[in-house]
Amino acid sequence: MNTIEVDEFKFLEVSTNPNILISLKGEKNFCELNLSDKSNFLKTNFGLYRYSEFEQVHGVLIDGLDTSEKNEFDGFITKEKNHAFAIKTADCIPLVMWDDKEELLCGLHCGWKGLQQGIIGKALEKRS
């Protein structure tokens, strides 16, 4: 794993195919940027044309499988390229799964409520 520093922001590169980065605390904190600034930063520095983050509610709704009028999701599933997704965590587990054959990326915010309600199984069913 490599540490990447851009304009005093720090990231940990977990994977290069697919490209998975974790924002770390640096001189500047990526999480403190507003949505528009995050999107512009990722486009300028990483060539990503779209950025999505959700209102995480410790549930089982997954963007790409479910709909939510309030943008309340605890995960995403996509085949879309050059699209960054946020998974915000404190004491929950960020789980990222990649299906190389299907080129399907899934990211889940796994709190105890979502785990108890089967968020991982729900995401894996989509892959089948």
Predicted regions: what they are:
Residues M1-S128:
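Active-site microenvironment for binding and transforming phosphate-containing groups
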